């Protein structure tokens, strides 16, 4: 059975980018710039100060208004980026 990995650390980097760490050690920068335009629950994220208020809740990244992003989506996104980087750099 597949184990869902939880976000254990989130740190704001710049613009719409957070450095995210999962419970299995997978870590890296994720660009969240696509989310502020994805409907009313995410529209407050257009405000940079509000965007930086992200916190961890239930193993994923969430914001005070109840917006959150499925941890498996974040994991898949980061894993894909990591695999692309490794392939590009011969690792």
Residue ranges and their predicted role:
Residues 1-91:
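Motif-centric detector for short Cys/His coordination patterns
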């Amino acid at each position: 059975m597949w184990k869902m990995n939880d976000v254990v650390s989130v740190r704001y980097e710049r613009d719409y980018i957070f450095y995210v760490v999962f419970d299995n050690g997978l870590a890296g920068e994720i660009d969240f710039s696509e989310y502020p335009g994805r409907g009313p629950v995410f529209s407050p994220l257009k405000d940079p100060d509000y965007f930086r208020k992200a916190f961890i809740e239930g193993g994923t990244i969430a914001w005070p208004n109840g917006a959150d992003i499925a941890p498996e989506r974040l994991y898949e996104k980061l894993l894909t980026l990591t695999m692309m980087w490794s392939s590009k750099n011969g690792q």
